[in-house]
Amino acid sequence: MTKPIRNVAVLGATGSIGAAALDVLARHPRQFHVSLLAAGQRVDALLALCRTYRPDHAVIGDATLYTTLRDGLNAAGLATKAYAGEAALAELVASTTCDTVVAAIVGAAGLHSTLAAARAGKRLLLANKESLVLAGMLLMREASISGAEIIPIDSEHNAIFQCLRSRTTDGVHRVTLTASGGPFRGHNRTMLAKITPTQAMAHPTWSMGPKISVDSATLMNKGLEVIEAHHLFGLPSEQIDVLVHPQSLVHSLVEFIDGSTLAQLSLPDMRTTLAVGLAWPERIGSGVQGLDLMKHNRLDFEHPDTETFSCLRLARDAMQTGGTAPAVLNAANEIAVSAFLQGRIGFLTIPALIEHALTTLPRYEADTLETLLTVDTETRRITHAALTHFPLPL
């Protein structure tokens, strides 16, 4: 029997993960229809995607760009309806417009639409790690109530998901997330003090956006992923390890209590995990070639240097503290990374600002969205204010 076409919303469509998702979707027009595209401010790029994919709806996050979007769609002769703002996106995501949501909006800005998809019982391909870090308990609770199917798109969590064939962790002894080590693996703090934004965005194996590239360079990306794994799979910190694996071919390992270890290997390309999420439990072509072990025949592993790259340690500390501490970590990191990319602070000031926020703000129970958003706002305020107290980049 022919399966119905899945209607897919791609949030963060103009970013690197959005582009990868659309590439996979375009390969399977009989299985998927792009029903909604959403972007933050890149209205021209969103219009170009609308001309290619002809979605039913398009949303621009910046409400001041609504007229540009609407007029551009009309000029192109498209029937695509234009919307603007966070509330409009959340309403569309929760409606019958889509049954599958690729949540790839970077940062806390993606939280409302991600929660809306979870509450509405959608299949949620989760690439917005900040939603789990900021509000993981709430997100997983909403998904449990509604029956939403959360499939992680980060390569590490997707690998664990595949090894477990679900999110059930019965019989698991521990999981190991791998990290490339970023472009500065082996650097000391003296060397890191001179790092520029351009250098930090030059990731050795993955093609990613600016913010995620910097997070990878500081190892904050891996710290956030430890917190994600805790929420996604219900594992305590002591059952979540991290190893640096510069080849980025082994994406995670799952060790079971019987001594067995399963690992997922593939070339570093987000289209693989997106194809898994879109078709699961079936498999579809992603456009990614299989792994040639004769060509890629070296696999190295080492422990991360958490003294030099302290963001990973700070993330673990925030997870152990619990409550609103991960929300503070996330918000302070977003402000610090943005300031670094603007050339306002040095590379080593990123963890310093995060630690300042974690030690300054009190811990509260993370039991409501209102509490989390209040803490997020306050963290951004004090981190912004602290920027002037740290030395300028060298």
Curated annotation (Swiss-Prot):
Pathway: Isoprenoid biosynthesis; isopentenyl diphosphate biosynthesis via DXP pathway; isopentenyl diphosphate from 1-deoxy-D-xylulose 5-phosphate: step 1/6. One of its GO terms (biological process) is isopentenyl diphosphate biosynthetic process, methylerythritol 4-phosphate pathway involved in terpenoid biosynthetic process. InterPro entries: DXP_reductoisomerase, DXP_reductoisomerase_C, DXP_reductoisomerase_N, DXPR_C, DXPR_C_sf, NAD(P)-bd_dom_sf. Gene3D superfamilies: 1.10.1740.10, NAD(P)-binding Rossmann-like Domain. Keywords: Isoprene biosynthesis, Manganese, Metal-binding, NADP, Oxidoreductase. It catalyses: 2-C-methyl-D-erythritol 4-phosphate + NADP(+) = 1-deoxy-D-xylulose 5-phosphate + NADPH + H(+). 1-deoxy-D-xylulose 5-phosphate binds at K129, S155, E156, S180, H203, S216, N221, K222, E225. NADPH binds at T14, G15, S16, I17, G40, N128, E130, G209. Coiled coil: none annotated. Its cofactor is Mg(2+); Mn(2+). Its EC number is 1.1.1.267. Mn(2+) binds at D154, E156, E225. It is an enzyme of class 1 (oxidoreductase). PANTHER family: 1-DEOXY-D-XYLULOSE 5-PHOSPHATE REDUCTOISOMERASE, 1-DEOXY-D-XYLULOSE 5-PHOSPHATE REDUCTOISOMERASE, CHLOROPLASTIC. Belongs to the DXR family. This is 1-deoxy-D-xylulose 5-phosphate reductoisomerase. It comes from Xylella fastidiosa (strain Temecula1 / ATCC 700964).
